[in-house]
A protein has these predicted regions:
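Long alpha-helical HEAT/HEAT-like repeat alpha-solenoid scaffolds in very large eukaryotic proteins
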Residues: 36-37, 41, 45-50, 142, ...
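Buried hydrophobic core positions in alpha-solenoid tandem helical repeats
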Residues: 1-2, 43-46, 93-97
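Alpha-helical solenoid repeats of the armadillo/HEAT superfamily
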Residues: 6-25, 34-37, 49-80, 86-89, ...
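Eukaryotic acidic, Ser/Thr-rich intrinsically disordered low-complexity regions
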Residues: 90-156
Length: 156
């Protein structure tokens, strides 16, 4: 199944993506780990650049289910999510970040959830508020205004 997902013609890859996503949705952690060992992450990540929003969504759901298992396995040992590392190595993180610009709101929402939950990435709109502003060739970082009456450093 993973080989079909990776190398078959698009129509067959779509069906394989459905099957793998369904397996990650209802499968045990051992079954999901087996799919990962067989190499399902990279072909799922490759589907993220496709033009069919339904297949992109299916691939995102499969990746999210895999990341969830990785998180559950990492938590007791206070370790890194190995599945997140594998997704990053398969260029999945970059592709998920790029999908934040997708016109389909469901895809956008799923990407935000994955990035915030498994990669510690904040929503772009929140990050934009933290960007320095430039005025008169000087940068401002949105520092809070001084309290009325100024600061009191006398220690009283």
């Amino acid at each position: 199944l993973v080989q079909l997902l990776a190398k078959a013609e698009f129509e067959i890859r779509k069906e394989a993506a459905w099957a793998i996503s369904n397996a990650t949705s209802g499968g045990s952690p051992a079954q999901i780990n087996f799919l990962v060992q067989q190499g399902c992450i990279r072909p799922l990540c490759d589907l993220l650049t496709g033009s069919d929003p339904k297949i992109v969504t299916i691939a995102l759901e499969g990746i999210e289910n895999i990341l969830k298992v990785g998180e559950e396995e990492a938590k007791p040992m206070n370790a890194q999510n190995q599945m997140a590392i594998l997704v990053s190595e398969a260029e999945g993180l970059n592709k998920i970040e790029d999908l934040q610009q997708h016109s389909n709101n469901d895809i956008y929402e799923k990407c935000i959830k994955i990035l915030e939950t498994y990669f510690g990435v904040e929503d772009d709109s929140e990050m934009a508020n933290l960007a320095p502003s430039e005025e008169n060739n000087q940068f401002g970082f949105g520092a809070a205004a001084a309290p009325q009456g100024g600061f009191d450093f006398s220690g009283q």
